[in-house]
């Protein structure tokens, strides 16, 4: 969780703040702003009354699995991969006033709506890869619209006070 906190602080939160978004929802590896931010009709968002339908989980439980493939042709592949490779992890609570952790659920129609062409303010990051010498790497991306965004590897060091971002390595920018 400390790795995710450091990555969110260094990569995603500044971009959402720069664009004037309010709270942020982390959903199945995808970051989506809560509705109520400025100009909500221009960005995909999750309304507070939708939170129950998305089955918010306790802050200490998070299901990690492969996600992100879209389109009906890929649905079966994604579900098959997730069924073979999913695993449950119990994580300490990520206490943030502006971040909510939601249990990844099957959101084919929601994902389609949230990642519609021209949408802005979507981001996400991979599960961290750890080294034995106290480092971690995370793949992070931020999409600010059609043909707008970037992706990078985030290298973190484990110090006495926790994980800190050491550097980011840009992979692509649009």
For the regions a protein language model found, what residue spans apply to each?
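Short beta-strand edge/turn micro-motifs at domain boundaries
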Residues: 155-173
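Flexible low-complexity loop/turn motifs enriched in small/helix-breaking residues
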Residues: 1-150, 171-174
């Amino acid at each position: 969780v400390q790795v995710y906190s450091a990555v969110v602080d260094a990569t995603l939160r500044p971009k959402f703040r720069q664009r004037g978004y309010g709270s942020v929802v982390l959903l199945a590896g995808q970051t989506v702003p809560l509705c109520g931010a400025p100009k909500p009709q221009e960005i995909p968002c999750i309304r507070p009354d939708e939170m129950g339908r998305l089955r918010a989980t306790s802050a200490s439980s998070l299901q990690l699995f492969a996600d992100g493939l879209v389109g009906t042709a890929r649905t079966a592949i994604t579900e098959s991969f997730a069924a073979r490779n999913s695993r449950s992890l119990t994580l300490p609570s990520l206490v943030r006033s502006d971040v909510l952790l939601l249990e990844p659920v099957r959101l084919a129609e929601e994902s389609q709506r949230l990642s519609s062409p021209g949408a802005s303010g979507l981001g996400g990051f991979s599960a961290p890869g750890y080294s034995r010498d106290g480092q971690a790497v995370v793949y992070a991306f931020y999409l600010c619209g059609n043909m707008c965004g970037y992706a990078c590897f985030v290298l973190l060091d484990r110090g006495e006070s926790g994980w800190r971002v050491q550097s980011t390595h840009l992979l692509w920018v649009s």
